[in-house]
Amino acid sequence: MSAPRIGVLALQGDTREHLAALREAGAESMPVRRRGELEAVDGLVIPGGESTTMSHLLKDLDLLEPLRGLLADGLPAYGACAGMILLASEILDAGAGGREALPLRAIDMTVRRNAFGRQVDSFEGDIAFAGLDVPVRAVFIRAPWVERAGDGVEVLARAAGHVVAVRQGARLATAFHPEMTGDRRIHRLFVDLVTGVV
């Protein structure tokens, strides 16, 4: 079987780190900035960044509705931090003044932006992750958390009593940044979701 082609939405965030992590996890990876690139991938990573800015870049580049359509048609997706926020069906504290974060509605969950606090409240720690024997080193930067996980959404990890990782079908989301550590198990899990191994 050939390696899946997985795109990384390259509007903001740790694009290079995600591209490298996906390659190390066995995928062919490519940056995605245009509709044609979006339509050429088997799966998509939405990295961290600023969710309101990313939403409006998607809109300005005419990617928002095509991406929503591809997700509705079943495109596998993984969102980290701001990516988790965007994959949600509902966003709390989404922003104001016409600059709100816009939900892609790919995972049936309600996510609260910046739930763990501001930049100064960023932290890291080891957390248990469903299906993995050894805890994951999780880096949280102005991280969200999941306030509601819908039916069919599997909770994969918690931190400080809050849900910070979920899966729904071939959709994965984490409130933390696995690309910032050398641990490739989260990216490998997403590659397996794209190829249908899990």
UniProtKB/Swiss-Prot annotation:
Record-annotated active site: 81 (nucleophile), 177 (charge relay system), 179 (charge relay system)
Pathway assigned in UniProt: Cofactor biosynthesis; pyridoxal 5'-phosphate biosynthesis
Alphabetically ordered keywords of this record: Glutamine amidotransferase, Hydrolase, Lyase, Pyridoxal phosphate
GO cellular component: cytosol; glutaminase complex
UniProt keyword Lyase, yes or no: yes
EC number, UniProt record: 4.3.3.6, 3.5.1.2
Catalytic activity: aldehydo-D-ribose 5-phosphate + D-glyceraldehyde 3-phosphate + L-glutamine = pyridoxal 5'-phosphate + L-glutamate + phosphate + 3 H2O + H(+); L-glutamine + H2O = L-glutamate + NH4(+)
Domain of life: Bacteria
GO molecular function, one term: glutaminase activity
InterPro entries per UniProt: Class_I_gatase-like, PdxT/SNO, PdxT/SNO_CS
GO terms (BP aspect): glutamine catabolic process; pyridoxal phosphate biosynthetic process; pyridoxine metabolic process
Pfam families: SNO
Residues that bind L-glutamine: 49-51, 113, 141-142
Gene3D superfamilies listed in its UniProt record: 3.40.50.880
Role of this protein: Catalyzes the hydrolysis of glutamine to glutamate and ammonia as part of the biosynthesis of pyridoxal 5'-phosphate. The resulting ammonia molecule is channeled to the active site of PdxS.
Family per similarity comment: Belongs to the glutaminase PdxT/SNO family.
Subunit structure as annotated in this protein's UniProt entry: In the presence of PdxS, forms a dodecamer of heterodimers. Only shows activity in the heterodimer.
Protein name: Pyridoxal 5'-phosphate synthase subunit PdxT
Organism: Mycobacterium avium (strain 104)
Source taxonomy: Bacteria, Bacillati, Actinomycetota, Actinomycetes, Mycobacteriales
